[in-house]
Each structure stands twice: as C-alpha cells, then as structure tokens.
From Swiss-Prot:
The lineage of its organism: Bacteria, Pseudomonadati, Pseudomonadota, Gammaproteobacteria, Enterobacterales. The keyword Transmembrane applies. Coiled coil: none annotated. It is a multi-pass membrane protein. This is Protein AaeX. GO terms for cellular component: plasma membrane. Belongs to the AaeX family. Keywords: Cell membrane, Membrane, Transmembrane, Transmembrane helix. It is found in: Cell membrane. The keyword Membrane applies. It comes from Edwardsiella piscicida. NCBIfam families: PRK11594.1. The gene is aaeX. InterPro entries: DUF1656.
C-alpha cells in the first residue's frame, strides 16, 4: 500500500486504503443481497459477525488486487 500517494480532496487527505474500502462496499452489498435469499443466513450463528468478516475478506481481496 505504500506505493500509492495520499489523495487530497477539498483539503482532506485520504490514504489509498480508503478507496479500497469504498470499492469493497458495493461488492459487499451485492454479495449480501445474493446470499440472503439463498438461506445461508439461516445456518449462520451470528449474521452481523459474518457480515463483518465478509466485508473484511472483500476489503483484503480488493486491496490485494488493486493496491
């Protein structure tokens, strides 16, 4: 992550990881919308914890691929 510069927008500086977080968000929403009707959430013990882990995995994937 150290190769990309810090972006400054309207006087606010954003690290490159911020844009990876934003890129992972639509992927998370899409994947969650696909998984909910499949019945997978009925078998999951803690759906909020699963969602957090899913978003973390998607963030890692996006940051690994694009940063």
């Amino acid at each position: 992550m150290g190769t990309l510069p810090v972006m400054v927008l309207f006087g606010l500086s954003f690290p490159p990881a911020f844009f990876a977080l934003l890129a992972a968000l639509p992927l998370f929403w899409l994947l969650r919308r696909l998984l909910q009707p499949s019945g997978l959430y009925d078998m999951i013990w803690h759906p909020a914890l699963f969602n957090c882990a899913l978003y973390g995995c998607l963030f890692y994937l996006v940051s690994w691929l694009f940063i």
